[in-house]
Amino acid sequence: MKIAYFDTEIDPTSHKVLDIGCILEGGRTFHSHSIPGFVDILKGVTFICGHNILLHDLKFIHQSVTAAGIQLSNAIDTLYWSPLLFPNEPYHALLKDDKLQTEDNNNPLNDAMKARDLFHDEVASFLRLKEDFKRIFWLLLHDQKEFAAFFSCIGYNCAKTETEAIIRQNFHPYICQNADLQRIIGAYPIELAYSLALIACNNRNSITPPWVSKNFHAVESILFQLRGKPCLTGCAYCDRSLDAEQGLKDFFNFDAYRTYEGQPLQKKAVEAALRNKSILAVFPTGGGKSITFQVPALMSGQNVKGL
């Protein structure tokens, strides 16, 4: 199954194709502005692959791709897979937000080679995932245009099963048991996949890449629904990770908040913040106001990357 990795340089005003770089899996290269030459090297290719090609390159050269006999549904975009497979900070060395790290900004052949290297790393990373995590990604993403070609190319599929059940089974200690997962799965499968990847990496310094937040706005809301909103009945996750006293212990190693005239004002203020509620609490000078801001902020940073 042949794959062509490519990148283009496009005039931002005229949208004219200024340069094209392409490398086949076997090593044959193409570097020219010639559209007929690009079509020629693509003949016999099954999949095309590049970085940010769905939002950028294919807008300008999609006719060349189809002229070579390649279905546009067979376009693999490494951009969308990167936050799923490299969520840990520091991130993949070839990435800088939605761009490839490159020494030469005007050499599409060099960027095509970088896209090839990144794709190979993504495939290797996917294959190293636990089987249940592979299944979760497939169940959420196999019919999404940004992800379907990747699964087809590597030949991965699995039996359809209850998506909510397998997510709850694997993320039981890390998300609220009363979150409306079924609604999120139906409405925001891509955003949920990005959220789960970030949760699973368990690295407080890892964040959602800016381009993901820009293009998939619901990620922030989903993280909040899964990990930042205490449920009314309580559950294993909320009782541990959204508990005001546990947060005080975790971050400051204090066992209890101060009380004032018998009132636990600090604790009430922190609990109100954790529940996104308003409260008016009047503290004496030096009465520990700062900790009522710090504890919920630090807990938000840890739970939903909200700091």
Map each language-model feature to its residues.
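Conserved SF1/SF2 helicase motif Ia
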Residues: 282-287, 291-307
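Two-metal-ion RNase H-like nuclease active-site motif
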Residues: 2-11
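Conserved DEDDh/DEDDy metal-dependent 3′-5′ exonuclease domain
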Residues: 24-92, 99-126
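Conserved pre-motif I regulatory segment
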Residues: 232-284
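Acidic, Mg2+-coordinating catalytic module of metal-dependent nucleases/exonucleases
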Residues: 94-178, 182, 186
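Structural motif
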Residues: 3, 46-49, 305
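Short beta-strand scaffold segments in enzyme catalytic cores
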Residues: 18-24
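Interdomain "pre-motor" coupling segment immediately N-terminal to P-loop NTPase/helicase cores
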Residues: 186-243
